[in-house]
C-alpha cells in the first residue's frame, strides 16, 4: 500500500499584548468602529520587546508536539514559514529546532508571505510520504515590527502569532492531502511589499526607515486578486480531491480580511457556518493565520475522524494556493 500522511497534532501561540481597535483608531484619527466594519477585526496581538520570532514559533511547535504525543527524535523535518525571521541570515528554523530539542531534524525557512503555510504543508507532506518520517510545520510572524504606523492599510490589519502542525506517515489514502492547487502572479509583485532590506534596495546610512516597513499600494486590487486566486485554487484542489464544496466540513481560509474569505466562501458555495473565523480576535498574522485557526478550531471542537478540511490563502507576490486535507 502506498504511504500517505496524516495530521497528528496542532499548536498555536500569540504574544501577551492585546491591542484593541480604539488604540489604533485614535492614533489614525478614524471614527469608532471603522476597522471592524471594513476588516472584521476587533483586536489583535502584538509582540512585546521580549518576544522573538523564534520564541513564538517554539511555543507553537512545543504545543503541537505535545498534542501529537510523539517522541521528538521521530521528527525528520521542520519547516518554518515566515516573513519576519529573527535575522536576514541565518535562517531561524535551525534555532527553533534546537530550542525544541529536535536533534535529528533538518530545518529551513520558507518565505511565502500569506500563502507560506500552504506551501510548507505541501512540502512536509511530500517529505513524510517519501521518507516515512514525521514533519513539524510552523508558521509565525511578528508583523507589528514591520507596520508603517502612518499607513492605514497596514496599521489596521497586521498582527503577530504562530501556529503549528505535526504531520506523520500513515497508510490510509483518505487522510492527509487529498488535493492541492497553487498559483502565482508576479505582475502584481509590488502590491504588498517591504521595499528595502533585500539586495535590490540594501541597507545604507541614508536609508529612509519608511522603506523598511510594510506598504500596500492598492487595497482594492489586493482584495479582488485575493478573492480570485483563493477561489480558483480552491476549485482546482477540490476537483483534484474529488470532493464537492458542500462536502467540506470546515473551510479554514487565510484570515486576511473577513470580506475576502466571506466572498470566497460564497463563490465556492460553502455554508457560512463551515468557515472557521479567527480574525475578529487575532487579526492578520500572514502565514500563521491558517495553522493558528486550525489549532483554535480543534481546541473548541476537536476534529472528528473523516472530516474533510479546505485550506486556502493568497497574498504578497502574488502567491496563493489551496489544499484539501482528510483529518
Swiss-Prot record:
GO terms for molecular function: 3-oxoacyl-[acyl-carrier-protein] synthase activity. Its EC number is 2.3.1.-. Disruption phenotype: Inactivation of the gene leads to biotin auxotrophy. GO terms for biological process: biotin biosynthetic process; fatty acid biosynthetic process; secondary metabolite biosynthetic process. Keywords: Acyltransferase, Biotin biosynthesis, Transferase. Residues 255-259 are annotated as: ACP-binding. Pathway: Cofactor biosynthesis; biotin biosynthesis. It is an enzyme of class 2 (transferase). The keyword Membrane does not apply. It comes from the Bacteria. The active site is at residues 114, 254, 284. Belongs to the thiolase-like superfamily. BioZ family. HAMAP family: BioZ. This is 3-oxopimeloyl-[acyl-carrier-protein] synthase. The gene is bioZ.
